[in-house]
From Swiss-Prot:
Compartmental location: Spore core
The name this protein goes by in its record: Small, acid-soluble spore protein O
Region (Disordered): 1-49
Entry's Gene Ontology BP terms: asexual sporulation; sporulation resulting in formation of a cellular spore
Keyword Ubl conjugation among UniProt keywords: no
Superkingdom, taxonomy of origin: Bacteria
Length: 49
């Protein structure tokens, strides 16, 4: 069969598709630095704190 790309991702949104990014959550801001308040409430990093 071979590997298939996941159907639930939005094409062009993220190169690493279907890798737990939350399907388009916050990818457009991935390169910007977060403020202190955003860093406290960052959904991607909350499990690592």
């Amino acid at each position: 069969m071979g590997k298939r790309k996941a159907n639930h991702t939005i094409s062009g949104m993220n190169a690493a598709s279907a890798q737990g990014q939350g399907a388009g959550y916050n990818e457009e801001f991935a390169n910007e630095n977060l403020t202190a308040a955003e860093r406290q409430n960052n959904k991607k990093r909350k499990k690592n704190q």
